[in-house]
Amino acid sequence: MMTMRIAMISIHTSPLQQPGSGDAGGMNVYIISIARELARRGVDVDIYTRATRPSQGDVVEVESGLRVINIVAGPYEGLSKEELPTQLAAFAGGVVQFAKCHHMRYDVIHSHYWLSGQVGWLLRDLWNIPLVHTAHTLAAVKNAHRSAGDTEESEARRICEQQLVDNADILVVNTPEETNDLVRHYDANPDSVAVIAPGANVELFTPGTQRNTEQSRRCLGIPLHTKVMAFVGRLQQFKGPEVLLRAVAEMLERDPDRDMRVIMCGGPSGAAATVEHYIELTRSLGIAHRVRFLDPRPPEELVSVYQAADVVAVPSYNESFGLVAMEAQASGTPVVAARVGGLPIAVVDGETGVLVDGHDPIMWADALEQLLDDDPTRQQMGVAAVEHAANFTWAAAAEKLESVYGDAAMLDVAQCHDRYAAGSDRA
């Protein structure tokens, strides 16, 4: 059996970048994690991304069968994600040049996010191979769920996403809810959508012993016997950090002597975002002495944050799945999350955590108080959370994705030749 070779496209963020700040987040974790598992299954994966510094080198050999290829497209620094559409042609040209010079032939293209999808669409027509596309987020959904004052996604992005829905051979989504979103907002054909739940690294993210928890808290400078809430992710309005901080202020207004701490682990994302904005918010709310801000951490260190926490809060305005919620549960920590997007699948309400309707800080304070004050229920949820997370692994996700690639390759054999032979003037 011949080895399958996949060209993944992730133009706006490298899967090797530290998640939790800038444009690096759950998508980075998704791409590198599932690509590693595909490589271990014998699938060769090349991930094309835009070079952001000269020291990166053209090719990074991550492990056997997995490479990250850095393509120069525009200046290394100074371009925001919103400006990257100006470099799509340069990036596509760089991918084509690299593949030609190194005699690369691929079986399937898999693009991630709408910017990469535009490049993938072009490459599909050029290479005459099928395109699998994963949106990760959708403009129409983000706009429908955005918070007051948050920036609206552009109509140009929505149009590009519509083009990808209409032209990709297979669309991969995380949950059935995402399928519904594609059908509702983009008139997608549900038969062209494959649902593959992401996973968590359950070998790394494991429940710690009491000694692990105490050691983690000592390293973080947190008292051993206080109640701890953690927020992990980019500090941007859409992720809802302000919701959590205002909920904490509400809890302390009700009971100023409540013994608790909050860990905010992540960096700013977006042109106007700064950590100082949230630090100043804690000061204005009178809770600065209860909140500790941490820089983004690699997974090997992040597990200690999850283990140090009694509860992990995910107050996002939308999540296609919620990898932070799954990592926290794999670590044995219950989650309080917004009932949006894929979070009701990632978190089992009343069993592995609590889902909150809406983003009212008072409602969040109620939910957090109830869980923090009920030690037996919280401990029971922690045990159930580990069992639940065990059903979501990257190995299982990669097995399903490899099957999708096989289906796409068969589609190419059966249909793509006639389609392109009949009319390449469509491009």
UniProtKB/Swiss-Prot annotation:
Keyword Nucleotide-binding: no
Similarity annotation: Belongs to the glycosyltransferase group 1 family. MshA subfamily.
Record GO biological process: liposaccharide metabolic process; mycothiol biosynthetic process
Keywords from the UniProt entry: Glycosyltransferase, Magnesium, Metal-binding, Transferase
Role played: Catalyzes the transfer of a N-acetyl-glucosamine moiety to 1D-myo-inositol 3-phosphate to produce 1D-myo-inositol 2-acetamido-2-deoxy-glucopyranoside 3-phosphate in the mycothiol biosynthesis pathway.
Phylogenetic placement of the source organism: Bacteria, Bacillati, Actinomycetota, Actinomycetes, Mycobacteriales
Listed name of the protein: D-inositol 3-phosphate glycosyltransferase
Binding partners and assembly: Homodimer.
GO molecular function: acetylglucosaminyltransferase activity; D-inositol-3-phosphate glycosyltransferase activity; magnesium ion binding
Binding, UDP-N-acetyl-alpha-D-glucosamine: Q18, P19, G26, R234, K239, R297, E319, E327
Binding positions for 1D-myo-inositol 3-phosphate per the UniProt entry: H12, D23, A24, G25, G26, M27, N28, K81, Y113, T137, R157
